[in-house]
């Protein structure tokens, strides 16, 4: 909907109160000034994830998944699992996000699509807070998400090698301004 209203920068901020909205201006500035077309706020860069209360098991899973994604996607992000991201309208018009999952792995599919189309992703450090009222996915859905992340990353690598052609890596053809 943001694209339909003419937005040039679209910010996704999970509504679980774990991330500060105080970085919105800085993140938008990076995109508006052409430094990066996509920016992710990283809980890992500033080493604040554990200090902010991230459960140890989630931290370990984050590091494990990020390690394998960096290898399979041939990138060097500090994390792929943040709920705080910003995109230029150009990027969202290009990637085929309509082909993505309707679950938590959707966000991860978007990052793989962004890399597929040759865009770079910038990162800024972001403090986070984990507390009882903050929403978090349960263990079962976390496992499903983790397997989905590995699937997307493997699809990306196999597609780069020309072995498969998943729909999510095809250009968006149904964008209407």
State where each predicted segment sits.
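Hydrophobic helical membrane-anchoring modules
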Residues: 26, 74, 98-177
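Acceptor/aglycone-binding surface of glycosyltransferases and processive sugar-polymer synthases
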Residues: 1-5, 9, 21-104, 131-140, ...
